[in-house]
Amino acid sequence: MAWERPLNNSQTPRAKNSSRRSLLPSTASIERCTYQLADGTFVTAEMPDRWMDRSQAGESLVAHVVTSKFCDHLPTYRQVQMFAREGCKLSESTLNQWVMEVGNRLVPLYLAMKAVVLAQCYLQADETTIRVLPEKGNNKKNMKSGTHLGYFWVYRSPGLNLPIFDYQPGRGQECPKAVLRSFSGVLQTDGYKAYDAVARDADGRIELAGCWAHARRKFVEAERSDPKAVAVILRGIGHLYAIEKIIRQKGASPEEVLRLRARARTLLDKARPQLEALLMDLRPKKPLRQAIDYTLKRWDKLLLYTERPELEIDNNAIENAIRPVAVGRKNYLFAGSHESAEIIAQLYSFMAACKIHNVNPTEWLADVLVRLPGAKPSDYPKLFPSNWTKTVHPHEGLSEEFFLDDLEAKPTTEAE
């Protein structure tokens, strides 16, 4: 409460509301399952479902640790320091064990979500690196600074808005081939040659679509050497994105999408001969020539989105899902093993899905760890972050005093 200074001595002071924000230390609680009655008798409540037998760590605690690492990019050693400041002594090995155990228990749910995503007829794909500590006896191939360079291959279903991270030790074409061996539909990529090999060996099952964000990036990189020509090209690409903005704002139907994108197709049909003519006037090593060459080689793939209303103009959504990995690896640096990298890929899949669907990842994980062991495979889709609804547990929100009062009450008998 604050007081305004009166204008004169006869004026009554007037109160006005004021507020300030404070930060309270985090708290941890211990759930007691045994209570003593007034007569000294001990009563033990029925044991609730637990995420891991013989573990004193509750679901909310391990969910907090996992979320802190994969959403907030806090390595476990830093979390140990933070817990210590709050008076909670934990070891880094304990936290790492929890993370691995959580990942292992989520494997059935991850495989179910992966199967659902790969069953769609339109996917986007991209990849990013992860450093992995080598196993004993590994050769020096693909090694740098004593670590192995592994890859997260990421597949996203725009229809479901679900991403899947898949860890592979390399970046060869055999990696996406193994994952996409049963996929049939449109695969949108940045033009990496491994995906061309996947489509070529798929017997017509896979059609490739291009990404205008990657094509635009090539021209941005050439802007310094040919600013005037690049400015014209970037303005033209900007018109394509302006049309997409109109589509999103209108919530356009598939028919309207095709009608609006027909304007984009007209612009592109006019642009191609101009790009081809400009290409002939540029030296081979000029960045602008390389940008035009990249675009023309993928022209049909870049046009495909104008013919299919369900396709997106670029791969930006999957890049947004991947971006937290880049921040995370700057903090925790590497995975401890290939097995750990697989677990990390699974957890990033769920954390990314929670972010996309505005789900609190800590609440989701704590709830799923309890529900998953008793769930049937047919119920797994209900636990995906995209479909999840929070479970209200029987004792949630009831204080310890409630139970004590209830237990201390005198029992009634039939005679009474």
Residue spans for each PLM region:
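Catalytic center-proximal scaffold of phosphoryl-transfer enzymes
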Residues: 5, 30-416
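Short, conserved DNA-binding cores of transcription-related domains
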Residues: 1-35
